[in-house]
Design a protein with these regions (language model features):
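Start-of-domain marker
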Residues: 21-82
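Bacterial Sec-dependent N-terminal signal peptides
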Residues: 1-22
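Flexible, glycine-rich surface segments
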Residues: 158-246, 250
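Conserved small/polar residues in nucleotide/adenosyl-binding loops
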Residues: 289-294
């Protein structure tokens, strides 16, 4: 009996080592669309879910339990003749070592997502062409999710995924669709990718690694050491802000991390709290108004 079980596990091993990378929850919110057959929105949700979760996106060896938890929420603003105008909220999380806590990595809203989709139309993957703007947008954010996740585990670990995202952006620029072009918007897909690959903001990727591996992951063993590393990362964030105050990385960090930092420093010495607050309020003036209101 034991030999049979072992044989079964050996047969299963190749499939476990080549598991898909993502466990993505997809939602398509059509509440703003009236007088339309809602079935197309459910079909779209199912198609996107299968497209993301059933695909192997890289050569990385990831077991089923290591799949990255993420979500994509498409809010449909307009729908006419198979043309969708949407906002897309992308979120991803990763577990913190030696704890049950998960930390947010991405919490990003794309306000310019438009695509054509006919019900039951297959979503076709391609690395070398734009099959549809929908799959191009999905591909881009999948690669960004993978890049940011791998950056949090190893220094510059996400580079291969940013290179793939760069290919998608280059292809997207040749289309007439919004969101792909430089200088079109400071928070579009082109701006998001550029922030991760430009030399001027390279320090962000290092602080991202320090914050997670040296900071959060360390706190289960030593709260003080882990928190000190997070404080160092915040000081690095200030340098990124000074070099590129309009970078999309600044609101990206805020949307993912500010609530978490309240808990990180809840039991820190007063002097440490004040120092961190002073640094962050210089980057995010909204904190000053929040403090005054409190």
């Amino acid at each position: 009996m034991k030999r049979n079980v072992l044989y079964f596990l050996l047969l299963l091993l190749p499939f476990l080592s080549a598991a898909q990378e993502l466990n993505c929850r997809v939602e398509v919110n059509s509440d703003q669309i009236q007088g339309t057959n809602k079935e197309v929105f459910m079909t779209l949700k199912e198609a996107i879910t299968e497209y993301i979760n059933d695909r192997k996106w890289s050569t990385a060896q990831i077991s089923p339990v290591e799949r990255i938890d993420c979500s994509m929420l498409f809010t449909v603003k307009e729908y006419t003749d198979n043309r969708f105008v949407c906002e897309l909220q992308v979120q991803s999380r990763r577990p913190v070592y030696n704890s049950s806590y998960t930390t947010t990595l991405i919490n990003f809203k794309d306000t310019k997502v438009e695509f054509n989709y006919q019900q039951y139309e297959p979503l076709v993957f391609s690395e070398t062409s734009i099959e549809s703007n929908l799959t191009a947008v999905i591909n881009f954010y999948v690669y960004m999710i993978l890049g940011v996740d791998f950056d949090s585990f190893s220094p510059m670990g996400g580079t291969p995924f940013y290179e793939l995202a760069h290919q998608v952006v280059n292809l997207g620029q040749s289309s007439m669709e919004a969101g792909w072009k430089a200088f079109e918007d400071t928070r579009n897909r082109h701006a998001l990718l550029s922030a991760f690959i430009e030399q001027g903001t390279a320090g962000f990727r290092q602080l991202w690694y320090d914050y997670h591996r040296g900071g959060l992951d360390e706190m289960a063993l030593s709260v003080d050491k882990g928190r000190a590393k997070i404080t160092d990362a915040i000081q690095q964030l200030q340098k990124v802000y000074e070099a590129a105050p309009m970078s999309v990385l600044i609101p990206l960090f805020k949307d993912a991390k500010l609530d978490e930092l309240v808990n990180v420093y809840s039991k820190a010495p007063v002097s440490e709290k004040e120092s961190v607050y002073e640094t962050l309020s210089g980057i995010y003036p909204c904190l000053l108004y929040t403090s005054d209101a409190a």
